[in-house]
């Protein structure tokens, strides 16, 4: 369940923008909300605005985040991360993406930034009983696991590259529930419809041919 998504410096989006599913103070239609702890969550939402106002690029940012989490484990040495930065942003300005979500009744917070086509930083926290616990923080290639995870990410750290997300590496080379839950949220729970795709048959065939994770299930 999505709670909040933020991004900046992505295509036409220069400054940070935020999309929240957390309800405001209006309790007119309280029966339509979903409760999670102290949060009152909208079950659906609509983004609307004028043509060219950035709606599609905001969805594009969420799609970019999903795809990078799911597939960056396959990035080869020397292969950069595509950074769709704002055309007026300086080359050294990072593109930032962050998200909060609930999976199996636990809240998670995850985010990363891309600078000059490389992963700059990354983090994952979760909130058992409402209290923040660090799973990992990462700056460049320096990964700092939380106290509960000392030593369990050694293999994942050994394969980390500056073009790979650590979440993607750890999901494939560790057996940590919090990592798996976060990874599966992106891999299965987020579904992005792309209106630019007209032929879904060709798109499906292309995915089956090029997406290694899908190949494993075929």
Residue ranges and their predicted role:
Residues 1-64:
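Pre-Walker A-like glycine/lysine-rich segment at the N-terminus of P-loop NTPase domains
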Residues 34-36, 40, 45-46, 50, ...:
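Conserved P-loop NTP-binding catalytic core
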Residues 7, 11, 101-103, 126:
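Short acidic, glycine-rich loop/turn motifs
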Residues 3, 95-97, 163:
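Structural beta-strand/beta-sheet cores of well-ordered domains, especially the beta-sheet scaffolds
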Residues 17, 23-25, 90, 140, ...:
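Solvent-exposed, flexible loop/coil residues
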Residues 109-218:
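Electropositive, glycine-dotted interaction segments
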């Amino acid at each position: 369940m999505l709670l909040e998504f933020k991004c900046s410096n992505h295509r036409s989006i220069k400054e940070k923008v935020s999309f929240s599913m957390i309800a405001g103070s209006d309790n007119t239609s309280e029966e339509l909300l979903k409760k999670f702890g102290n949060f009152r969550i909208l079950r659906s939402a609509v983004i609307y605005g004028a043509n060219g106002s950035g709606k599609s690029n905001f969805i594009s940012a969420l799609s970019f985040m999903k795809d990078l989490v799911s597939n960056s484990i396959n990035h080869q040495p020397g292969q950069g991360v595509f950074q769709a930065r704002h055309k007026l942003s300086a080359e050294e300005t990072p593109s930032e993406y962050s998200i909060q979500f609930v999976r199996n009744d636990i809240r998670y917070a995850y985010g990363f930034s891309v600078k000059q086509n490389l992963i700059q930083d990354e983090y994952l926290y979760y909130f058992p009983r409402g209290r923040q616990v660090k799973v990992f923080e990462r700056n460049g290639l320096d990964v700092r696991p939380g106290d509960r995870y000392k030593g369990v990410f050694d293999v994942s750290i050994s394969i980390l590259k500056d073009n790979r997300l650590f979440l993607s590496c750890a999901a494939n080379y560790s057996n940590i529930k919090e990592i798996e839950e976060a990874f599966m949220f992106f891999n299965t729970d987020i579904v992005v419809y792309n209106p630019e795709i007209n032929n879904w048959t060709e798109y499906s065939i292309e995915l089956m041919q090029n997406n290694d994770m899908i190949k494993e299930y075929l």
